[in-house]
Amino acid sequence: MSRIGKLPIKIPANVDITCSGPDLTVKGKFGTLHNTIPDAIGIEEIDGSLIVNVKDNTRSNRALHGLYRTLINNMVTGVSEQFQLTLNLQGVGYRASVQGNSIILNLGYSHPVELVIPEGISVEVVQNTTINLKACDKGNLGLFASNIRSWRPPEPYKGKGILYKGEIVKRKAGKSGKK
C-alpha cells in the first residue's frame, strides 16, 4: 500500500464531490474540476473524508494509488483555496502587462511576446515585473507558468530571466581571460 495513497483526503464544508462511474467531479467556491479515475482505483467517503483504495494489488495499480490520491487532493484544494504562482522578471527592460485575454511580455526581443491566457487562470501584473497567477487546476497553472518562463529561462552568468518566487539562480564565474 502506498504511503501517500493510504492517507485520507479531508473534504471542506464548501466542496461537493460526485463520482459517477469513472468520472469524478469536484465543485467548490472557485470552480469545478473533472477527472477520469481508472477502474483499478476505488473511492469511498467516510466521515467527511475520502479514502482512495486499490482494487487488486498489482504493481501497476499500486503505482496509480498514490498518483490518483494526490490528483484528487489537488482538485479538492484547488476548488476550495486556489493555487497561486508568482513569477519575477529580472533584467533591464523586462516588462509584463495584461491586455484583455492575453499577457504581453517585453523580454529583450525585437518584438513583444503575446500569450493567450488559458481559461480558468487569472493573471495579475504588479509593478510591471511581477506576475501573479491563480487557478484551481494545479496542472494547467504550472503548464502556463512554465510556458511563460520558457521565453527567458534564468541564465547563470548575469542572473537575468523569468524566475519563480523564491528561486535562487546558481551563478557562474565568467571567462577568466588569457594568462
Swiss-Prot record:
<dbReference type="GO" id="GO:0019843">
    <property type="term" value="F:rRNA binding"/>
</dbReference>
<keyword id="KW-0689">Ribosomal protein</keyword>
<protein>
    <recommendedName>
        <fullName>Large ribosomal subunit protein uL6c</fullName>
    </recommendedName>
</protein>
<comment type="function">
    <text>Binds 23S rRNA.</text>
</comment>
<keyword id="KW-0150">Chloroplast</keyword>
<dbReference type="GO" id="GO:0005840">
    <property type="term" value="C:ribosome"/>
</dbReference>
<dbReference type="InterPro" id="IPR019906">
    <property type="entry name" value="Ribosomal_uL6_bac-type"/>
</dbReference>
<comment type="subunit">
    <text>Part of the 50S ribosomal subunit.</text>
</comment>
<dbReference type="GO" id="GO:0006412">
    <property type="term" value="P:translation"/>
</dbReference>
<dbReference type="InterPro" id="IPR002358">
    <property type="entry name" value="Ribosomal_uL6_CS"/>
</dbReference>
<keyword id="KW-0694">RNA-binding</keyword>
<dbReference type="InterPro" id="IPR000702">
    <property type="entry name" value="Ribosomal_uL6-like"/>
</dbReference>
<dbReference type="Pfam" id="PF00347">
    <property type="entry name" value="Ribosomal_L6"/>
</dbReference>
<dbReference type="GO" id="GO:0009507">
    <property type="term" value="C:chloroplast"/>
</dbReference>
<dbReference type="InterPro" id="IPR036789">
    <property type="entry name" value="Ribosomal_uL6-like_a/b-dom_sf"/>
</dbReference>
<keyword id="KW-0699">rRNA-binding</keyword>
<dbReference type="InterPro" id="IPR020040">
    <property type="entry name" value="Ribosomal_uL6_a/b-dom"/>
</dbReference>
<dbReference type="GO" id="GO:0003735">
    <property type="term" value="F:structural constituent of ribosome"/>
</dbReference>
<keyword id="KW-0934">Plastid</keyword>
<comment type="similarity">
    <text>Belongs to the universal ribosomal protein uL6 family.</text>
</comment>
<dbReference type="GO" id="GO:1990904">
    <property type="term" value="C:ribonucleoprotein complex"/>
</dbReference>
<keyword id="KW-0687">Ribonucleoprotein</keyword>
